[in-house]
A protein has these predicted regions:
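Non-transmembrane, aqueous-exposed alpha-helical and coiled segments at domain scale
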Residues: 1-281
Length: 281
């Protein structure tokens, strides 16, 4: 049976999600930060992690953004195939929600309308929107503001099949080493393996929206996540890039089938402010 959803409901929810995501970290991220502060072996690193916790508390109490870079709005829409939208075009409804959220929430406007001319759009639109059609009559919205200190440190590697899993490990470590302090560690590392050039990047982006206390349900991928987190934390980059045992809070890996001639790997890095909010309509 077809279910009708008014697109102004999409606008309303995305507006609220933009504000919420920029003011509060999810429970899994908050717990990971607390655990990192408890287990960090460097005194300076521990001090930095405690300061980051203080920052989160102040943002919560005073209703101000966790970070001055309130990001480019990345929206994932999982639309049930039995949903019919009425009202404005869905893309317009999404962008209107972002516009209202960033304007009424007094969030920094960080989007330029053209990558070469570079004039600010003054309302943080347009968003980057990813659609997928799924069974059912619901719409799942994931709103993830992505700051560019860490985004600029992200990489895509087009490996050869002969590079194998060791090549994948090397690519992940190379991306994190090159990022160093510029990605505002402790970081969350999203990895996409497989697909095509663009698919592996999308997999990596989606991996960042998975709770950091959840692993892949594929056993050997779960093992790889745990191994890479351990190796990354042995690099000594540490909180704020000033040394320590907490360079990353999590490594989340997504995989997809790929061509016999390729092994694409994308590493999408996020800082400790790994923001995302999920709602289902």
């Amino acid at each position: 049976m077809i279910r009708t959803i008014q697109t102004d409901e999409i606008t309303k929810n995305i507006k609220e999600m933009c504000i919420q995501a920029n003011h509060y970290l999810s429970a899994d991220m908050d717990a990971a930060m607390k655990h990192a502060a408890d287990t960090e072996q460097s005194e300076l690193g521990k001090k930095i992690l405690n300061q980051l916790q203080d920052n989160l508390k102040i943002a919560d109490e005073e209703m101000i953004p966790i970070c001055q870079d309130t990001g480019m709005a990345v929206i994932f829409l999982e639309v049930g195939q039995d949903v019919h939208f009425e009202g404005a075009a869905i893309e317009d409804a999404v962008n209107e929600g972002v516009r209202q959220g960033y304007t009424e929430g007094f969030l920094r406007k960080s989007v330029v309308g053209d990558p070469l001319i570079r004039e600010n759009t003054k309302d943080n639109t347009p968003a980057v929107i990813h659609y997928s059609i799924v069974p059912g009559d619901q719409v799942k919205i994931t709103m993830a503001p992505k700051g560019f200190g860490s985004e600029n440190m992200s990489r895509v590697f087009m490996l050869k099949p002969a590079d194998g899993i060791e090549g994948v490990k090397h690519a992940i470590l190379t991306a994190v080493k090159d990022a160093g302090p510029n990605a505002c560690p402790p970081m969350v590392v999203g990895v996409g393996i497989g697909g095509t050039f663009e698919k592996c990047a999308l997999l990596a982006k989606q991996a960042l929206t998975r709770p950091v206390d959840e692993h892949s349900d594929i056993p050997y991928v779960k093992d790889l996540e745990e191994e890479m987190l351990s190796k990354i934390n042995q690099l000594g980059i540490g909180p704020g890039g000033l040394g320590g045992t907490t360079t990353a809070l999590a490594v989340n890996i997504n995989t997809y089938p790929t061509h016999i001639a390729g092994l694409p790997v994308a590493v999408n890095i996020c800082c400790h402010v790994n923001r995302h909010v999920v709602r289902t309509l």
